[in-house]
UniProtKB/Swiss-Prot annotation:
Gene name for this UniProt entry: rsmG
Family from the record: Belongs to the methyltransferase superfamily. RNA methyltransferase RsmG family.
Catalyzed reactions: guanosine(527) in 16S rRNA + S-adenosyl-L-methionine = N(7)-methylguanosine(527) in 16S rRNA + S-adenosyl-L-homocysteine
Binding-site residues, S-adenosyl-L-methionine: G73, I126, E127, R142
Compartments it resides in: Cytoplasm
Record's keyword annotation contains Methyltransferase: yes
EC number: 2.1.1.170
Cellular compartments per GO CC: cytosol
Family matches, as InterPro entries: rRNA_ssu_MeTfrase_G (IPR003682), SAM-dependent_MTases_sf (IPR029063)
Residue pairs linked by disulfide bridges in the UniProt entry: none
MF terms in GO: rRNA (guanine-N7-)-methyltransferase activity
The name this protein goes by in its record: Ribosomal RNA small subunit methyltransferase G
Role according to the record: Specifically methylates the N7 position of guanine in position 527 of 16S rRNA.
NCBIfam families: rsmG_gidB
Protein's organism: Methylorubrum extorquens (strain CM4 / NCIMB 13688) (Methylobacterium extorquens)
Length: 211
C-alpha cells in the first residue's frame, strides 16, 4: 500500500483521525480475510485506498445529507461498510448491507463489530427483503448487475422517493439506453473521481414504461 495514496485519500475526503483508524482496521480485516475468502480481486488490494476506499467515499459527497443508506450485494462492504465507517460520527447515520453469501456476511458482521460501524447485515436475497426497506434515502450497488436489473430490484424504493446511486464503468451509457427500454426515470451521469471512464448513475422518480 502506498502511504502517500492513503494520506491523499484521507485529505481529499476530509476524514477525521478516528475515521481513518476505522478505515485502517477495515483494510487490515480485508487483507486478512482475503487470504481465505477471496473477497475482492487480488490485484486491487495493492490499490485498496484508490480502488475501494476512495471509490466508495465519493458517494458521500453526492448525497451529503442522507443518513439512511442501503447497499445491495455488499460483498466485501464496498461501498456500504466503508460509507458506514465514514458516517458513523454523524447522528442517525446507518447503512443496511444486503448480501446472500453467508461467508461474506461473516466478514461484514465481524468487521462491523470490530470497527463499530453503524450497519445492519441482511444475509438474504435482494428480492426477499427489498420491500421491507422502503424508508431508505439512498440505495447503492457496485459491480452487481446491469442497470436494468438494478432498477427492477429497487423498484419498490425508487418509486417511493429513494434515490439510486449506481457506480458504473465505461458501459454506463449503453446500460442507460437499455434500461430506458423498460423504465422511465430522472437520471444524472456523474463523473467518477477515481476513474475517468467511469460514471455514477443517479436515478430518481422511477416508473415502468407503458407496454
Amino acid at each position: 500500500m502506498s502511504t502517500d495514496l492513503r494520506t491523499r485519500v484521507l485529505s481529499e475526503h476530509h476524514v477525521s483521525r478516528e475515521t481513518a483508524a476505522s478505515l485502517d482496521l477495515y483494510v487490515a480485516q480485508l487483507t486478512r480475510w482475503q487470504t481465505v475468502k477471496n473477497l475482492v480481486g487480488p490485484a486491487t488490494l495493492k490499490e485498496v485506498w484508490h480502488r475501494h476506499i476512495a471509490d466508495a467515499l465519493q458517494l458521500l459527497s453526492i448525497a451529503p445529507e442522507a443518513t439512511r443508506w442501503l447497499d445491495l450485494g455488499s460483498g466485501a462492504g464496498i461501498p456500504g461498510l466503508i460509507l458506514a465507517l465514514a458516517g458513523k460520527e454523524r447522528p442517525g447515520f446507518h447503512v443496511r448491507l444486503v448480501e446472500s453469501n453467508a461467508r461474506k456476511c461473516a466478514f461484514l458482521s465481524e468487521t462491523a463489530r470490530l470497527t463499530g460501524a453503524p450497519v445492519t447485515v441482511h444475509n438474504a436475497r435482494i428480492e426477499a427483503v427489498i420491500g421491507t426497506l422502503t424508508d431508505t434515502e439512498i440505495v447503492c450497488a457496485r459491480a452487481l448487475a446491469p442497470l436494468s436489473q438494478l432498477l427492477a430490484w429497487t423498484e419498490p424504493l425508487l418509486t417511493s422517493g429513494t434515490t439510486g446511486l449506481f457506480p458504473k464503468g465505461r458501459d454506463a451509457a449503453t446500460e442507460l439506453t437499455e434500461a430506458e427500454d423498460e423504465w422511465t426515470f430522472t437520471r444524472d451521469l456523474i463523473p467518477s473521481r477515481t476513474d475517468s471512464q467511469a460514471r455514477i448513475v443517479r436515478v430518481t422518480s422511477l416508473s415502468r414504461v407503458d407496454p
